[in-house]
A protein has these predicted regions:
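Conserved internal helical-beta-strand scaffold that buttresses enzyme catalytic cores
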Residues: 1-197, 201-214, 219-230, 234, ...
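Active-site-proximal loop->helix
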Residues: 240
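A mobile, often basic/glycine-rich helix-loop segment
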Residues: 299-304
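Conserved phosphate-handling catalytic cores of large alpha/beta enzymes
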Residues: 224-235, 243-289, 293, 297
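Flexible glycine-/small-residue-enriched beta->alpha junction loops
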Residues: 305-311
Length: 345
């Protein structure tokens, strides 16, 4: 009944004011600007671009804000390689300089990146940062490092969250599940196919393992390396596994930026109210190949003929705001130029 009422009332889909819309466009411009700069400056280098699901960046900004409003002190993120560089810079807060140093040579020591021993490829690194939330103080953000074993990080993040939830309490009191919140970002193919996903979900509601709910994002670019969904899973949706555990799933169009934020508001409210998992299936596409050295038109020629012509979510939203008279196309281009200027500095 609670979930039904929330959806029917559209309380999670409030009318956004001009300031909030401008901020959303800024976040989209930053996400797209970073990817486009790296594509030009380091042509062919692997980075596993977020392009096609760029809305993840403003979604993470908002979910962290909502977690802080519910009493959260720390967010622990787990994800594979796709989009990690964007999350490291725009969510965790490492500098562009530290990120670009990873493209130039040996790992930079002394920054925010979690680097030890001989180091690792840039899209495996973790990092720690903080964010100031207006009126609420500071919230800690940690992105756990991850190997190329995609969903390997799921139980690790759950374990990190559970241990820290107990550290926030005293005298053996119950864990504070509102203080420490885990967020997992899955790939669509891996989420449906890898057993560790089901194993972690199976533990989520057990007294000895529960973390008070994980917020899940599926970066659904509708292809797994070169495999189409119909050839990679026996279910309609990449998120169908969650149905077996009674976990709510919300499918959202990655090109509808404001709807993406509405999904986040509902997910955060559900997790806070029920202390249980929630899944957002962010349905988009992958603008380049599996990595930037691949040519996807060899294996998905018709799909990539369409993707090449398709505008980015930033461009779509900029057009929407221009039509609404909130931000002109010239102002949107100025915002793009400002992001590019920061990256060139």
């Amino acid at each position: 009944d609670w979930l039904w009422d929330q959806v029917e009332s559209e309380s999670h889909f409030p009318k956004m004011n001009a300031t909030d819309k401008a901020e959303l466009l800024r976040h989209l411009s930053e996400a797209e600007g970073l990817e486009q700069f790296l594509h030009k400056a380091y042509l062919g280098q692997k980075r596993f671009s977020l392009e096609g699901t760029d809305a993840l960046v403003p979604m993470l900004h908002l979910v962290i804000e909502k977690i802080a409003q519910a009493g959260g002190q720390e967010v622990i993120l787990g994800m594979a390689h796709r989009g990690r560089l964007n999350v490291l810079t725009h969510i965790v807060g490492i500098s562009y300089g530290e990120l670009l140093a990873e493209f130039e040579g040996p790992s930079y020591q002394g920054g925010q990146l979690d680097i030890s021993g001989t180091g690792d490829v840039k899209y495996h690194h973790g990092a720690r940062g903080t964010r100031v939330i207006d009126g609420l103080g500071t919230i800690r953000i940690e992105l756990a490092p991850n190997p190329s074993h995609l969903e390997f990080i799921n139980p690790v993040v759950a374990g990190m969250a559970r241990s820290r939830q107990f550290k926030t309490t005293e005298n053996d009191r119950p864990a504070d599940t509102h203080a420490i919140v885990p967020i997992l970002i899955h790939g669509d193919a891996a989420c449906a196919a890898e057993g560790v996903v089901a194993e972690t979900l199976n533990l989520a509601r057990l007294n000895g393992y529960g973390v008070g709910g994980t917020i899940h994002f599926i970066l659904n670019n509708q292809v797994g390396f070169t495999t189409d969904p119909r050839e990679g899973r026996s279910t309609v949706y990449a998120s169908d596994l969650a149905k077996g555990y009674g976990i709510p799933v919300l499918h959202v169009n990655a090109d509808d930026a404001e709807a993406c934020l509405a999904a986040v508001r509902l997910a955060a409210a559900y997790r806070s109210h029920f202390e249980d998992d929630f899944v957002i299936d962010l349905v988009g596409y992958r603008r380049h190949g599996h990595n930037e050295g691949d040519e996807p038109a060899y294996t998905q020629p018709l799909e990539y003929e369409n993707i090449t012509k398709h505008p980015t979510v930033r461009a779509i939203y900029a057009d929407q705001l221009a039509t609404e008279g909130i931000i002109s196309q010239e102002e949107a281009r100025t915002l793009e130029d400002a992001v590019a200027g920061k990256l060139r500095e």
